[in-house]
Amino acid sequence: MVKIVQRSIGLLGGSFDPVHKGHLIISKIALKKIKLSQIYWIITKKNPFKSEVYFPLKDRIKKAKKVTRNLKKIKILYLDKIVKSSRSINIVNYLIKKKGFKNIYFIIGSDILLELHKWKSWKKLVKLTKLVVFSRKGYDKKSKK
């Protein structure tokens, strides 16, 4: 009998404005601890909860590709144009329906957990994925409430 191995995929979404060490650190930890097959950094044009954009989208994508170029298990995706949305629920639905993604781990920081209730269809997002929350200095006590 052939055993089919289910690939576990991690999604780390955001504006990556700017890309920083924290993105790499949590990606590497998630790959190791959760035994993910792949992590996709889903870069969006703009964070709807932030008023300013510091770096152009093109530069953020270029920088993300540069810092991950030697990390085969981290891939960069920009799907806003294809999905016609930067909302996480729409991107996850697209990846499930059009790309056949299954066993998705949605990776966020504890700062984002505080805002999750403001996201469009956040309950559905949590049902479709396994939520992974990483500690973020200064937010942990607040996010536990």
What does each model-identified segment do?
Residues 1-145:
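Nucleotidyltransferase catalytic core that binds NTPs
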